[in-house]
Every structure is written in C-alpha cells, then in structure tokens.
From Swiss-Prot:
Function of the protein: O-methyltransferase that catalyzes the 2 O-methylation steps in the ubiquinone biosynthetic pathway.
Residues holding S-adenosyl-L-methionine: 41, 72, 93, 136
Keywords carried by this UniProt record: Methyltransferase, S-adenosyl-L-methionine, Transferase, Ubiquinone biosynthesis
Catalytic reactions on record: a 3-demethylubiquinol + S-adenosyl-L-methionine = a ubiquinol + S-adenosyl-L-homocysteine + H(+); a 3-(all-trans-polyprenyl)benzene-1,2-diol + S-adenosyl-L-methionine = a 2-methoxy-6-(all-trans-polyprenyl)phenol + S-adenosyl-L-homocysteine + H(+)
Entry's family note: Belongs to the methyltransferase superfamily. UbiG/COQ3 family.
CDD domains: AdoMet_MTases (cd02440)
Protein name in UniProt: Ubiquinone biosynthesis O-methyltransferase
Region forming the signal peptide: none
Parts of the chain that traverse the membrane: none
MF (Gene Ontology): 2-polyprenyl-6-hydroxyphenol methylase activity; 3-demethylubiquinol 3-O-methyltransferase activity; polyprenyldihydroxybenzoate methyltransferase activity
EC number: 2.1.1.222, 2.1.1.64
C-alpha cells in the first residue's frame, strides 16, 4: 500500500483565487489591497536584494543575472516589476487560471517571464535553485505550512535570500485583516483568510532554522487610511515581512 503524497495545495484556496483571477490587474477590483501594498514590498525587495548582491539600485536593470522565484505568483503583480528590473523570473502558482492570466498580461507587456502552473514541492523535487525566493502573501493559504516552508527554503541558493510576507495570528489581525477588511470594508472577498491558517513570526523563524536559513530582518507593514497607503512599521501585529538568507 502506498502512502499518500503530502501536498501544500488547499483545493478550496485554489478554487477561491481561480474564481476571481480575471481581476488580478484591475487596481480597483478584488485585488485592490495588493495593488496598494505592492509599492511598499517592491521597494523593500529591491533595497535588500541590491544591498545583498552589491547592485546599484539606481541602475536601470539592477537585478540583471539574478534568478528569482515568485511562489504563489497569482496574476504576476510581483513578477512583472522584478522582470523589468532585469531579474530572470519564474512565477509559479497552483492555479492554472492564475497562470493563464499572468501569461497573457506579460505578453501584452512584452515581458519574458517563465510562468508555471505547479507547486513549491514539485519545483523543489526538480532541484530548482534561486538567488531570491519571493514567498509573499501565500503561506497563509497553503494546507501544510511546514512542508511549504521546507520546499521553498530548499530552493534558496547558498548566499541567496528568501522574503516572506504574511499576516500574524493575533486578535488584532483577526479584527483588522479579516473582520475589518473582508466583512466591514469589503476590500477582499469574504473567506479570503482563515484565522487558524495565519502564521506567527516565530513559527517562520523556526522553519528557517530547521532549513538552515538565517533570519536577517523583520518588520511590520501598516495601513494609513488618510493617505490610503501602506508603510513600513515596527508593528508586526497584523501584516509583516521577514527576510532570511542561506549562508554562502
């Protein structure tokens, strides 16, 4: 009798995002919060990658020659700016519908991005390695966090980086990111996040340690309703980002 293979795929999550995939590139649509959040995370990624790999952030293509993986890439909101900055980008998502949307938009934008409808564990099993792994707003949607973090961590080259952005598992996050954002303000479709699947920073740190990655930075990201913008913060109670590296 064969053992059932472990997977990080949550079928209900894939169905949810596939259903609204056509709206990925509508800045006023279902993914408006990600469009608003994007400048903050892009600036952080560019700053840290340029510092790590001794690149001039003011150069037109400072990420030239670096291999990026955006896991759970959705419609490509991070893949496209990374490609414009010169990175060689693989965008992977378990939703084939998301990948089709991403491919069409990249073609319309004349960008060469390698989009694949696949999983983190399949890529890791194939021996894929990257200078930078972007694990952004996805860990809270997988069925097996330990397996997902193990698979994504395994793909970080020696000297490489992994960025993780997610939502903390706190009562404050439940009130703001779920009740507030999904039920009161309706920024996101109801059911986008489940409280029990949210991940605490210390849980990510434990996963990094197990995978021989070293945590090098962590910060909160908070929303300013007056400016309708997201900003870096010391407050990690709701949205936060962490950065880890694999020693060279």
């Amino acid at each position: 009798m064969t053992e059932t293979a472990r997977t990080t795929i949550d079928a209900s999550e894939i169905e949810h995002f596939s259903r609204i995939a056509a709206q990925w590139w509508d800045p006023q649509g279902k993914f408006r919060p990600l469009h608003k959040f994007n400048p903050t995370r892009l600036a952080y990624i560019k700053e840290k990658v340029c510092a790590k790999f001794n690149r001039d952030p003011n150069a037109p293509r400072p990420l030239e020659g670096l291999r990026f993986l955006d896991i759970g890439c959705g419609g490509g909101l991070l893949c496209e700016p990374m490609a414009r900055l010169g990175a060689t980008v693989i965008g992977a998502d378990a939703s084939a519908t998301n990948i089709e949307v991403a491919k069409i938009h990249a073609a319309q934008s004349s960008l060469d991005i390698d989009y694949r409808a696949t999983t983190a564990e399949a890529l890791a099993d194939a021996g894929e390695k990257f200078d930078v792994v972007l694990n952004m707003e996805v860990v809270e949607h997988v069925s097996d966090v330990d397996l997902f973090m193990s698979a994504t961590s395994a793909m970080v080259k020696p000297g490489g980086l992994m960025f993780v952005a997610t939502i903390n598992r706190t009562l404050k996050a439940y009130g703001l990111a779920i009740i507030g954002a999904e039920y009161v303000l309706r920024w996101l479709p109801r059911g986008t996040h489940q409280y029990e699947k949210l991940v605490r920073p210390e849980e990510l740190e434990a996963a990094f340690s197990k995978a021989d990655l070293r945590l090098i930075d962590k910060l909160g990201v908070t929303y300013n309703p007056l400016a309708d913008s997201w900003n870096r913060s010391r407050d990690m109670d709701v949205n936060y980002m962490v950065l880890a590296e694999r020693p060279a």
